[in-house]
Swiss-Prot record:
The gene is rsxB. Belongs to the 4Fe4S bacterial-type ferredoxin family. RnfB subfamily. It is an enzyme of class 7 (translocase). Binds 3 [4Fe-4S] clusters. Residues 108-137, 138-167 form the 4Fe-4S ferredoxin-type domain. It comes from the Bacteria. Keywords: 4Fe-4S, Cell inner membrane, Cell membrane, Electron transport, Iron, Iron-sulfur, Membrane, Metal-binding, Repeat, Translocase, Transport. It comes from Salmonella typhimurium (strain LT2 / SGSC1412 / ATCC 700720). It is found in: Cell inner membrane. This is Ion-translocating oxidoreductase complex subunit B. Part of a membrane-bound complex that couples electron transfer with translocation of ions across the membrane. Required to maintain the reduced state of SoxR. It holds the Pfam family FeS. Residues 32-91 form the 4Fe-4S domain. [4Fe-4S] cluster 2 binds at residues 117, 120, 123, 157.
Length: 192
């Protein structure tokens, strides 16, 4: 019985010593992250889609914060994310698709041909925002409100039943282009 207590005491002492060493090492050799990169990474949608040309949101945030990369390359985040990053960095907003000549990119949506879907769930596993629902060997469908059009679900599909299509405007999504509405100013006479 005495040897058990010696073993327990020795293991406890070793745990305390190694814990203290690890605690000291974590503070002594800590790497400080750039707070601007942290804030940019918090603004990005974390979909890890790669449409910006970087393998994920964190590398893109580092490129924007440290290397001066353009702030308009996040397609899933769109204009809202670009404006937040521009405000954070105190820079001028840029067109949200990365191409200066096209100010309003067409929103794309993944569409599944349900007749050809075999229910393999590879598209569900590839979707970074969980916009595809379905079960194994059952029909899958895309929730249009969540789909960012990142194209990551298209390649894994073995039957090639997924394609990206432009989103059609509906009465709910259509917006007035106020610059094309003719406005006529009528002078008003003041009567005393």
């Amino acid at each position: 019985m005495n040897t058990i207590w010696i073993a327990v005491g020795a293991l406890t002492l070793l745990g305390l010593v190694f814990g203290a060493i690890l605690g000291y090492a974590s503070r002594r050799f800590a790497v400080e992250d750039d707070p601007v990169v942290e804030k940019i990474d918090a603004i990005l949608p974390q979909s890890q889609c790669g449409q910006c040309g970087y393998p994920g949101c964190r590398p893109y945030a580092e490129a924007v914060g440290l290397q001066g990369e353009k702030i308009n390359r996040c397609a899933p985040g769109g204009e809202a994310v670009m404006l937040k990053i521009a405000e954070l960095l105190n820079v001028e907003p840029q067109p949200c698709d990365g191409e200066e000549q096209q100010a309003a990119p067409v929103r794309m949506l993944a569409v599944i041909d349900e007749n050809n879907c075999i229910g393999c769930t590879k598209c569900i596993q590839a979707c970074p925002v969980d916009a595809i629902v379905g079960a194994t060997r059952a029909m899958h469908t895309v929730m249009s409100d969540l789909c960012t059009g990142c194209n990551l679900c298209v390649d894994p599909c073995p039957t090639h039943c997924i394609e990206l299509r432009p989103v059609n405007e509906t009465p709910d999504s259509w917006k007035w282009d106020l610059n094309t509405i003719p406005v006529r100013i009528i002078p008003v006479e003041q009567h005393a």
